[in-house]
Amino acid sequence: AMCIVGEPTNMQVITQHKGKYSARAHFTGRSGHSSLPGEGVNAVEFASEFVVFLRRLGQKFRNEGPHDDEFVPNHTTFHSGVIHGGTQLNIIPQNCYVDFEFRNLPNHDRNELKGLIFDYLDNTLIPQMRETYDDVGVEIEVVSDMPGLATGDDEEVTRLVMELTGANTTGKVSFGTEAGVFSAMGDIPTVVCGPGSIEQAHKPDEFIELDQLARCEAFLDKLLAVLVRK
């Protein structure tokens, strides 16, 4: 078995991509009047401390590695994309959530990275939140947990797609695809190859150049001929 995932790679043969873990952290504090901050637990403040922790984790891996210079950026990254909490200025916010993610190099253990996050929450941040009240805390809602991809250049699928596209080299990308799932969970050798550029993805006026579509069509014609022969 083999698998070809048709995400936008400019028809380059991609054998490795980063994994991705994304989640929403729900912070539950205790409300009160802002003139008496000691009588409540400020969910926004603790959520902000969590965001700073994630930023520092990202800085740690940027500085200390592991590194792979064929990826851009060349290290595991952490990102906080959304923070929302509170109702008005003079009320201690009871609720806040943070949407965050990390994108790990394929050889950087996702479970180890998740462990760093939960260790910080369970052993540092939540105990601080519960110094006065024990009905406060943090819940993690997992949005996606996608393994990275690391397919060898000597795999049959890699050699086949290189031959059919005329590629001389393989590549690595920082965005994620279902390829990691097929490879890790289904034990199916997988590569990513498709028309268009990721630089035009997820933004207004997405487009794929006609030349890219023509190259993809030619590739599919050749692939179909190979499959018919087999």
Regions found by a protein language model. Name each.
Residues 1-22, 228:
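Acidic/histidine-rich catalytic neighborhood of metal-dependent amide-processing enzymes
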Residues 24-230:
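Metal-dependent amide/peptide-bond hydrolase catalytic core
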